[in-house]
């Protein structure tokens, strides 16, 4: 069968499995689960083992390689065999590298069920023998050696942790001693500042209360005359307004005292205003009475003068007699 047709058939199989969602156990790759070798065909003749490892090591670590060469000339025949460390990398290599092109040549990749190393002849070099026997992959350490090295590492780490903890404890003790030595010297000025703050606190509070009381008094004084004009006899309404104007933060006792004082002030002012109005009314009445009496006297005098003139005009003979 033509190698290109084999490439097409393998790709068609992979596509069908992907479309149908076939499980790994039922896949055609499961037939080669015991072999980690793959076959590479159609390689360019110029490629060496190193070039092949660089290309095909993308999906796993390569442990062994066998590039078939001509015994006389030493040139490659265009195909080789690869061995991966993990068998699952062979599945990835067959699915992805099958049908790729390197230097214009399509490459065929397929599984190998039972790979047998070629019979060694006397002409083979020592290097090729070592490669075929030991492989070209990195050696993994044995489990016993790895466990012993892991046991040694925690012991070393534990010792280092103990030393670091001791150093940290010493540093903390030194820092605590320095802080304790600094505390008595620094505590005295702090206490003084706290006392000064406590002393200034009530002073500020009292000054604020006095300022608020002073502000409330002129406001009350400004609003009193308006209340007089609006309410002639409304002492009770004034008291209500004054109670509303008082701040909420004042105590009940102080508010009651101020209300009583304001009541007495309002009463005194009402009395003085009544007396002033009565005095003014009496004075105006006296003036009107006087003006009336004066007008009466003037009219009476004019009448007398007229009468006397009439008498004189009526009796001129009496004047000459006298």
Swiss-Prot record:
InterPro entries: Nucleotide-bd_a/b_plait_sf, RBD_domain_sf, RNA_proc/Spliceosome_comp, RRM_dom, RRM_Ist3-like. GO terms for molecular function: RNA binding. Residues 134-322 are annotated as: Disordered. Keywords: Isopeptide bond, mRNA processing, mRNA splicing, Nucleus, Phosphoprotein, RNA-binding, Spliceosome, Ubl conjugation. GO terms for biological process: mRNA splicing, via spliceosome; U2-type prespliceosome assembly. Residues 195-223, 240-274 have a biased composition (Basic and acidic residues). Its main location: nucleus. Pfam families: RRM_1 (PF00076). PANTHER family: RNA-BINDING MOTIF PROTEIN, X-LINKED 2. Involved in pre-mRNA splicing as component of the activated spliceosome. As a component of the minor spliceosome, involved in the splicing of U12-type introns in pre-mRNAs. This is RNA-binding motif protein, X-linked 2. It comes from Homo sapiens. The gene is RBMX2.
